[in-house]
Amino acid sequence: MLTRKQMELLDFIKTRMDRDGVPPSFDEMKDALDLRSKSGIHRLITALEERGFIRRLAHRARAIEIVKLPEAMERAGFAPRVIEGDRTEPPRGARPVETANALDLPLMGRIAAGLPIEAITDGAQSVTVPSMMLSGRGQHYALEVRGDSMIEAGINDGDIVVIREQQTADNGDIVVALVADHEATLKRFRRRGGMIALEPANASYETQVYPDHMVKVQGRLVGLIRSY
């Protein structure tokens, strides 16, 4: 039997993994459950793990496996989901991209998961992605990640991120942001009054804060591809 907060956290983790392809950060969990500190999230995660609903994967940045779901969630159509950081074997049941229903997306260049770098938008190459990774309508494109500022969001140097092209974002979205019309970066988006905060997911980096007119959202993260 789960408490209300435990159920809320499990539901939030599942929802964000389905939406973004990566688990939420502890800060996002804290904000979503309206808790004052991350210690409360640690206790809830531990309780869910002890009850067999989730499993934390050692030595991987925020990798969480949802082992099972409460009966109420299963009846509503939820299914267990695993996001594992840098595992050496593909997930059980995974199929090669070429045998799945797949589409080619333009690989628009490299995106900085670190300090902003100049945007590269040649689109001369392409990458094949499962069509199920694309979120609804709209244009999509792919970028190669350079840097380690988003590792705690499960995004590593060398990963390919799938981006849905859009010009708006909600607080907490991981976005491609164009700074001062020439530097692109992959960060978590926060609006603070007339300012935009671009947050890393690595304690070694500082949040970048700009006047809102200096930041243009170019797209939102909807998927991630990693070579094993």
UniProtKB/Swiss-Prot annotation:
<dbReference type="InterPro" id="IPR036390">
    <property type="entry name" value="WH_DNA-bd_sf"/>
</dbReference>
<dbReference type="GO" id="GO:0004252">
    <property type="term" value="F:serine-type endopeptidase activity"/>
</dbReference>
<protein>
    <recommendedName>
        <fullName>LexA repressor</fullName>
        <ecNumber>3.4.21.88</ecNumber>
    </recommendedName>
</protein>
<keyword id="KW-0742">SOS response</keyword>
<keyword id="KW-0068">Autocatalytic cleavage</keyword>
<dbReference type="InterPro" id="IPR036286">
    <property type="entry name" value="LexA/Signal_pep-like_sf"/>
</dbReference>
<comment type="subunit">
    <text>Homodimer.</text>
</comment>
<dbReference type="InterPro" id="IPR006200">
    <property type="entry name" value="LexA"/>
</dbReference>
<dbReference type="InterPro" id="IPR006199">
    <property type="entry name" value="LexA_DNA-bd_dom"/>
</dbReference>
<dbReference type="GO" id="GO:0006281">
    <property type="term" value="P:DNA repair"/>
</dbReference>
<keyword id="KW-0805">Transcription regulation</keyword>
<dbReference type="InterPro" id="IPR015927">
    <property type="entry name" value="Peptidase_S24_S26A/B/C"/>
</dbReference>
<feature type="site" description="Cleavage; by autolysis">
    <location>
        <begin position="113"/>
        <end position="114"/>
    </location>
</feature>
<dbReference type="InterPro" id="IPR006197">
    <property type="entry name" value="Peptidase_S24_LexA"/>
</dbReference>
<keyword id="KW-0238">DNA-binding</keyword>
<dbReference type="InterPro" id="IPR039418">
    <property type="entry name" value="LexA-like"/>
</dbReference>
<comment type="similarity">
    <text>Belongs to the peptidase S24 family.</text>
</comment>
<keyword id="KW-0235">DNA replication</keyword>
<feature type="DNA-binding region" description="H-T-H motif">
    <location>
        <begin position="26"/>
        <end position="46"/>
    </location>
</feature>
<keyword id="KW-0678">Repressor</keyword>
<feature type="active site" description="For autocatalytic cleavage activity">
    <location>
        <position position="149"/>
    </location>
</feature>
<keyword id="KW-0804">Transcription</keyword>
<keyword id="KW-0227">DNA damage</keyword>
<comment type="function">
    <text>Represses a number of genes involved in the response to DNA damage (SOS response), including recA and lexA. In the presence of single-stranded DNA, RecA interacts with LexA causing an autocatalytic cleavage which disrupts the DNA-binding part of LexA, leading to derepression of the SOS regulon and eventually DNA repair.</text>
</comment>
<keyword id="KW-0378">Hydrolase</keyword>
<dbReference type="GO" id="GO:0045892">
    <property type="term" value="P:negative regulation of DNA-templated transcription"/>
</dbReference>
<dbReference type="GO" id="GO:0009432">
    <property type="term" value="P:SOS response"/>
</dbReference>
<keyword id="KW-0234">DNA repair</keyword>
<feature type="active site" description="For autocatalytic cleavage activity">
    <location>
        <position position="187"/>
    </location>
</feature>
<dbReference type="Pfam" id="PF01726">
    <property type="entry name" value="LexA_DNA_bind"/>
</dbReference>
<dbReference type="GO" id="GO:0006508">
    <property type="term" value="P:proteolysis"/>
</dbReference>
<dbReference type="GO" id="GO:0006260">
    <property type="term" value="P:DNA replication"/>
</dbReference>
<dbReference type="GO" id="GO:0003677">
    <property type="term" value="F:DNA binding"/>
</dbReference>
<dbReference type="InterPro" id="IPR050077">
    <property type="entry name" value="LexA_repressor"/>
</dbReference>
<dbReference type="InterPro" id="IPR036388">
    <property type="entry name" value="WH-like_DNA-bd_sf"/>
</dbReference>
<dbReference type="Pfam" id="PF00717">
    <property type="entry name" value="Peptidase_S24"/>
</dbReference>
